[in-house]
Amino acid sequence: MAISLATKAATDALKVNRAPVGVEPQEVHKWLQSFNWDFKENRTKYPTKYHMANETKEQFKVIAKEYARMEAAKDERQFGTLLDGLTRLGAGNKVHPRWGETMKVISNFLEVGEYNAIAASAMLWDSATAAEQKNGYLAQVLDEIRHTHQCAFINHYYSKHYHDPAGHNDARRTRAIGPLWKGMKRVFADGFISGDAVECSVNLQLVGEACFTNPLIVAVTEWASANGDEITPTVFLSVETDELRHMANGYQTVVSIANDPASAKFLNTDLNNAFWTQQKYFTPVLGYLFEYGSKFKVEPWVKTWNRWVYEDWGGIWIGRLGKYGVESPASLRDAKRDAYWAHHDLALAAYAMWPLGFARLALPDEEDQAWFEANYPGWADHYGKIFNEWKKLGYEDPKSGFIPYQWLLANGHDVYIDRVSQVPFIPSLAKGTGSLRVHEFNGKKHSLTDDWGERQWLIEPERYECHNVFEQYEGRELSEVIAEGHGVRSDGKTLIAQPHTRGDNLWTLEDIKRAGCVFPDPLAKF
């Protein structure tokens, strides 16, 4: 049958002008911008002192369909590996006990950071006016929801497959009494969501993600693998695949305010404050968790810190922002000095107050001590002597009634909490750079440990009103505080925290009560 002239004409035209068989995502992204609309006013909760330009672009140009396809593929690989392959191999019980305890802290604390990053990214969406910039922030909101679930899933997985689930399965209610909890909230919550949206972007994207993502999320996979943990790398490396887009969002935030006069006036100060506050917590806490919470070491924390924070971020990353007037933080040099001893100083406080935690802490053994001395000359004569004395006095034995915190007080070594960072500090035993200084404001005394934090506090003392663990529990007996904070296992009497990783000789509330440890307020003497 002969075809019609119209059909023939159409066929000939298609031969010359082939119909498209697909559309590139970048073309769709460009087309979607035509559907943008102007907002009469931004609805952000807090005003910003910066003006974000209306023509700012998004580097990755993500569209919802491609984003969903990409993340679905990653989740299939991640959960498929965890729920099938690693479960069949019994991966949960191949983790060294010391590292399994460390992950009780890392995954739980990081979950809080990811959760608050949801709100931080949404605040930036509210503040931005450029359609592409809003699109980048929206994708990050979805990422942070995913990351929150992933961190929670690590604790869930450990709860089911690790031999000591206590701490993994109930840290959300127990963590509040811990001496490291309020400091974590300071960097992972207050800094991300409180106040100026652009300042929050500096805290989250420019410092938290661009600076500390690598020494946290990337480095932790190396330490985990070295200690038999295949669970954490499976999840955290999937998390890290999203972080580059978040760093790009921070870069675009800076680009969007580059021509704003407020940028020249405030940006470098905000960056320095954000960096110092975060490093004041992350530098000692991550070093302590990696080196003291592992059996098999990867490298000295000071080397990891120097590579990722000082060279990669402070030099290369911030250097790329130099054309927009951004400078490396003035406090970076002091932070570099902190990276050598600060985590060892914190370790003393963490071990001394172990009953308030939700993980089991084993003192460094002979092999650990040799490693510390080889990499931190002078460690043995200071920290090693204290740990060895504690062990002789019965640190691990519940019958001894020995609480290291009481030993510190009896020997004149008061533990203070830095008001700005909320990090514990023992000035009389510290080898780091800090020193104690005390101020009074609104009828309340405040301890501070360094020049940069003191400067921040003096400018805005009302911003740092959070009471610390000693003010909260002054005059209270330790076992009462533990019971009130649900720091016990399912039997209602055995502590979740323990001073060793064995299954015997477990401390109970009665053991703690016999010691008669009562919290004093160290600032009462001033």
UniProtKB/Swiss-Prot annotation:
GO terms for biological process: one-carbon metabolic process. Its cofactor is Fe cation. CDD domains: AAMH_A. It is an enzyme of class 1 (oxidoreductase). GO terms for molecular function: metal ion binding; methane monooxygenase [NAD(P)H] activity. Fe cation 2 binds at residues 209, 243, 246. M.trichosporium has two forms of methane monooxygenase, a soluble and a membrane-bound type. The soluble type consists of four components (A to D): protein A, comprising three chains, in an alpha-2, beta-2, gamma-2 configuration, is a nonheme iron protein containing an unusual mu-hydroxo bridge structure at its active site and interacts with both oxygen and methane. This is Methane monooxygenase component A alpha chain. The lineage of its organism: Bacteria, Pseudomonadati, Pseudomonadota, Alphaproteobacteria, Hyphomicrobiales.
